[in-house]
């Protein structure tokens, strides 16, 4: 535990935001942009992604020669602030739209939701259809999934607890995986 805290403190000095920090409701939200083009692809992370900017990099780097790319790191993700506020879908959507606006990224968008953000993308398209040109799902969740979803909360909390203690540092299979080494799983 002590080693983890020392390493974490040293690592914090190495971290610099990869995107622009914009103010949303009094807190900083990270928005990364890259590329040019007539269409803007907005990558939307699911739950449990530490850094959406890095998580999507192997994909958006292949697209940024032809399209504008935007990655919004929701509160609690990446370089965005951690907030103790309601995380309902209306709040999250409002914050995402505000962050894009403050970063100067105008609709219409091609939404690229991963996992749980699929619901946010569908809701966005229903509520603001003029802002959504298309949705390209990246293994996205759909409403029917929630009827059958069975999240093992104790296992999830155990994982969070182990990460907080630094136990994941002792798992070389995670730190030395191909995805971590190269940023992608395949050529």
Can you annotate each of these PLM segments?
Residues 1-41, 64-67, 101, 106:
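Alpha/beta-hydrolase fold catalytic core
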Residues 1-6, 73, 111, 139:
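Gram-positive cell-envelope targeting signals
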Residues 27-79:
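Conserved HGGG/HGGXW glycine-rich cap/lid loop of the alpha/beta-hydrolase fold
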Residues 53-55, 80-86, 147-148:
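Conserved catalytic-core motifs of eukaryotic protein kinase domains, centered on the activation segment
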Residues 74-112:
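Active-site loop/oxyanion-hole signature of alpha/beta-hydrolase fold enzymes
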Residues 89, 131-187:
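Flexible "cap/lid" subdomain of the alpha/beta-hydrolase fold that forms the substrate-access gate
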Residues 106-150:
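Conserved hydrolase catalytic core segment
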């Amino acid at each position: 535990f002590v080693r983890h805290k020392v390493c974490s403190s040293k690592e914090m000095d190495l971290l610099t935001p990869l995107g622009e920090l914009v103010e949303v409701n009094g807190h900083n939200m990270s928005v990364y942009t890259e590329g040019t083009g007539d269409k803007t692809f907005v990558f939307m992370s699911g739950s449990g992604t530490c850094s959406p900017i890095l998580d999507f990099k192997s994909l958006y780097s292949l697209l940024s020669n032809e399209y504008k790319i935007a990655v919004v790191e929701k509160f609690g993700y990446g370089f965005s602030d951690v907030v103790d506020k309601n995380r309902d879908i209306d709040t999250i959507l409002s914050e995402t739209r505000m962050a894009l606006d403050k970063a100067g990224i105008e609709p219409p968008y091609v939404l690229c939701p991963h996992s749980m953000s699929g619901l946010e993308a569908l809701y966005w398209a229903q509520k603001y259809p003029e802002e959504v040109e298309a949705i390209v799902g990246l293994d996205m969740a759909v409403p029917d999934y929630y009827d059958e979803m069975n999240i093992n909360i104790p296992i999830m909390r155990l994982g969070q607890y182990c990460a907080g203690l630094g136990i994941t540092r002792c798992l070389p299979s995670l730190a030395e995986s191909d995805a971590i080494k190269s940023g992608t799983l395949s050529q």
